[in-house]
């Protein structure tokens, strides 16, 4: 069986590098399934979950990665994902995310309109909200 080489990179380094059966990317245009033999393409990543399925020889398990922004470069036998933000759903600590969100909101309240730091804290709050949404969705529906 053909395999798809996948590299998943975020700003702090390489998150994953190895073969997968297929993956479903979240893009601004919707979801995009990628299997071996896919046409060459570069897509902008949206906010949501990239769903990855391991090779059957590796157990065929699925794992989800929450992403926000970035790009994916696809060719016939591989995909390189360069995500602005990325975290495996299994690695999300809801209490830590809530704490980070509260701190960002406190800082946001202290920053005046027009201050360049405002965009940073707003982005941090959006990222935390996205993480919490996925944790809530996963526990409510019993996903993966």
Residue ranges and their predicted role:
Residues 88-144:
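Acidic/glycine-rich phosphate/pyrophosphate-binding loops and surrounding catalytic core
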Residues 4, 67, 116-117:
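A general marker of short, structured functional hotspots
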């Amino acid at each position: 069986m053909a395999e798809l080489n996948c590299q998943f990179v975020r700003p702090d380094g390489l998150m994953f590098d190895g073969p997968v059966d297929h993956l479903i990317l979240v893009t601004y245009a919707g979801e995009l399934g990628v299997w071996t033999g896919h046409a060459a393409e570069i897509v902008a990543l949206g906010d949501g979950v990239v769903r990855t399925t391991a090779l059957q020889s590796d157990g065929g398990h699925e794992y989800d990665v929450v992403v926000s922004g970035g790009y994916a470069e696809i060719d016939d036998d591989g995909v390189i994902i360069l995500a602005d933000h990325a975290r495996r759903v299994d690695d999300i600590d809801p209490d830590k995310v809530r704490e980070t969100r509260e701190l960002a909101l406190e800082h946001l309240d202290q920053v005046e309109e027009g201050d360049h730091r405002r965009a940073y804290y707003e982005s941090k709050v959006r990222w935390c909200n996205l993480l919490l949404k996925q944790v809530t969705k996963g526990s409510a529906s019993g996903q993966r």
